[in-house]
Regions:
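C-terminal and late-domain segments of enzyme folds
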Residues: 1-167
């Protein structure tokens, strides 16, 4: 129910589901582990009407979010909406990573963790018990916007860091 319209170096998201932008340009991996792992990825969630410049990575919120609340968790006097964020048991489930990012942004916490695994593995798969722990954490440029003006909670979240560790 959403799309990312790309025109040159500009992206605009349309639709209520939003889009997750994954920036791996500064990420690293440890090849010696022999399985997927990642350190230092960046995630941004863009909602309906939000824009992203692919060259500068500058995120511009939609007009209704720009008119709402700007959230900078490092700002003096920051008053978080959430006091806690749960450990997410199915972090790649429908909407789970976006909720985790929003809760992290608008809380005093520095990080949120969650698990991802495939319960439908083949019995002879040597990595059948392998899953991943995703660690989402605030970076120096993690900020966001919030608006409830259109009848539902709507967050735009910029530059949450991501580490993925095999478990």
């Amino acid at each position: 129910n959403s799309a990312a319209i790309i025109s040159g170096h500009a992206v605009e998201v349309i639709g209520p589901g939003g889009a997750l932008f994954v920036d791996l340009s500064g990420a690293t991996t440890d090849r010696s582990l022999g399985v997927f792992n990642l350190q230092g990825g960046q995630l941004s969630f863009l909602g309906d009407g939000d824009r992203l410049d692919l060259r500068t990575r500058r995120l511009t919120p939609s007009a209704h979010k720009a008119a709402g609340a700007f959230i900078d968790p490092r700002a003096p006097g920051f008053r978080p909406e959430y006091t806690d964020a749960p450990f997410v048991l199915d972090v790649l489930g429908d909407g789970a990573i976006v909720r985790a990012m929003s809760n992290l942004l608008d809380s005093p916490l520095d990080e949120v963790r969650g698990l991802a695994f495939d319960a439908r593995f083949a019995p002879d798969d040597p990595q059948r018990a392998l899953g991943s722990e995703l660690r989402l954490y605030k970076g120096p440029d993690t900020v966001g916007w919030y608006s409830g003006s259109q009848g539902e909670e709507a967050y735009t979240v910029a530059s949450v860091r991501l580490d993925v560790t095999p478990v």
